[in-house]
Amino acid sequence: MNPTQKPEPVYDMVILGASGFTGKYVVREALKFLQTPSSSPLKSLALAGRNPTRLTQSLEWAARPNPPPSSVAILTADTSDPDSLRRLCTQTKLILNCVGPFRIHGDPVVSACADSGCDYLDISGEPEFMERMEANYHDRAEETGSLIVSACGFDSIPAELGLLFNAKQWVSPSVPNQIEAYLSLESDKKIAGNFGTYESAVLGVANAEKLKELRRSRPRRPRPTICGPPAKGPTLENQKTIGLWALKLPSADAVVVRRTLTTLTEKPHGLPGINESPEQIQKREAFWSSIKPAHFGVKITSKSLFGIFRYVTLGVSLGLLSKFSFGRWLLLKFPSVFSLGWFQKKGPSEEEVESATFKMWFIGRGYSEESLASQGETKPDLEIITRISGPEIGYITTPITLVQCGLIVLGQRESLVKGGVYTPGIVFGSTDIQQRLEDNGISFELISKIKTQG
């Protein structure tokens, strides 16, 4: 072999952080597709992390009730050891990164992938991290052919695909003005979120100013052309169409969707693949030509005002205490207190996870004819409601979306962009990702399409 030639990867996929609370669920999901069916692109799998014993225990847990597959390798890697990450990248085609908070642990992994040409997916929901990775590593990843995509978990696959699914319903001459997502979390049992998710939220609020500084330092990008100005909706509303109270949510989803729409403005036909067939090019261009951009926002919902009060309490606690070190110490020391029981260090039980579900409603408002949008004070006269439903968000839906994105990267790499740092919507939107999710328990529905009084 030429000494300058990149060695052939030993593994198709490595799950980094496989012994973590989310990581073990990702392992369980990946095992479903390891050499099954025979056409699966996942032929070889390895688990990576700091502690081989814990990785082995994670594999045993994920394989239950079957014995753990002997073909799954256990590799040692540490985000604080760049050499171990570089070695990891030479051994695999794709890394699924489950090690958070990503603003602390993610940069070295992305750097190693961008330098080596290894593909990378993660489950980050941290806007500052994601935009910093784009700023720091996009050019290098383009050069080496490393495809780097964050937010491939519940943040932000449902929001991205939900927006695209709703946008596709606006058949010409109709155009959307605004699409709002309403997230409803349901469970038969009281379920506590994982501490890692909570820690990421605390650090995200604490570093909000750094995100503003990063954006100010970056070149201005073109904004999508949207028919009509954004509607000025209330912060709190009684959403009678779906029978829920709703509160505006400053989420990563809205940030990721806006980045996707910005990229689409720059590349109206999507991202050209490495070696697409004429049929694949036609399919991609037709898909993106059908997507009309809209103002987008996310709201969290509850059946009662008391539930909304709990969200407000959590938001106020994060906003007030995350800004200084002692406040962050309090938030991270006593997560159950400041989140009113929503987050705890030990995470939910398997029974609690199995009992939970989500619904994400997408209420689109726009115009039955594009010409109406330019008529001054004319209000939207068309409403389209779609919905995505699925299992628990953090430990069932997130592994499903991450693994399916990974399988697309492994099985359809020639039809994807060569390299760069991108959002999941622009990379996977025109693939068969929606059908894959539907095949794995996440449904997409058109609920209604009605004319309203403008």
Swiss-Prot record:
EC assignment: 1.-.-.-
Segments of this protein annotated with the region Disordered: 215-234
Keywords carried by this UniProt record: Acetylation, Membrane, Mitochondrion, Oxidoreductase
Record keyword DNA repair present: no
In-chain residues carrying the UniProt-annotated modification N-acetylmethionine: 1
Leader sequence segment: none
GO cellular component entries: chloroplast envelope; mitochondrial membrane; mitochondrion; plant-type vacuole; plasma membrane; plastid
Coiled-coil regions listed in the entry: none
InterPro entries found in the cross-reference section: NAD(P)-bd_dom_sf, Saccharopine_DH-like_oxidrdct, Sacchrp_dh_NADP-bd
Pfam families associated with the record: Sacchrp_dh_NADP
GO molecular function: oxidoreductase activity
Annotated localization: Mitochondrion membrane
PANTHER family: SACCHAROPINE DEHYDROGENASE-LIKE OXIDOREDUCTASE
Family in the record: Belongs to the saccharopine dehydrogenase family.
Protein name: Probable mitochondrial saccharopine dehydrogenase-like oxidoreductase At5g39410
